């Protein structure tokens, strides 16, 4: 008996590359929905991008969340104090971002937002975790704005959960995404999240997420952050809320193992 063929879609941006790479991606995508026994995706938008609207509408595509270890990310005051002391930002208003320095993460716009916040709050700092080809460009932009003493580039971190504790606000202005795990992690840490409207609504696991258009003036993003800054300091335990939405990796692992064992009842839900 042949093994079932499973394919998974993780990016709503599939095929956006220009030239031959984009053409090849779109062509190679065609057989997926016809040859695979199971079509998995991390979000409805990613499913449509890779498998097409009809496959999603017909209920052939299963959404399986990019689950996280919610326990690992829950808020701990002692960890917050430790990291803020380590970085020398004990009394600062900390805007945080976790993501690769690539064009899709839109760090240029993130810096524009931060610059507007700094005009109103002298205690604001920006902490960015990640590496990528756009990092030097962003460093130069920050230097040009005279904000180099307020921006922290921490590179890739294996202990990223500690840094979510140190943030006061999480800002994520991506140009496109599948279902960003960092936004789920930020919510598990009890952070208010201001997210691009290009990011799927499926990642709003809690009331902590709000969306804004990335085409609008960055000043409007800054104003929302400033308006909610005081409320954002009151952190809540969101572990169970995240788990209830199917984003707890421990629960999902049990369901996934059972599916691989039996070939029946994939975790998640059909994407319609």
Label each region the model flagged:
Residues 4, 8-44, 48-56:
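A conserved, positively charged/aromatic
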Residues 48-52, 59-60, 65-86, 250, ...:
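Acidic anion/phosphate-binding donor-loop and adjacent secondary structure
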Residues 93, 97-116, 133-139:
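A conserved mid-protein helix/loop that constitutes part of the nucleotide-sugar donor-binding site
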Residues 139-155:
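Nucleotide-activated donor-binding/catalytic signature segment of Leloir-type glycosyltransferases, i.e.
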Residues 156, 175:
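Aromatic "clamp/platform" in nucleotide-sugar-dependent glycosyltransferases that forms part
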Residues 192-196, 201:
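Short hydrophobic beta-strand element within catalytic cores of glycosyltransferases
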Residues 232-268:
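A charged, aromatic-enriched C-terminal amphipathic alpha-helix characteristic of glycosyltransferases
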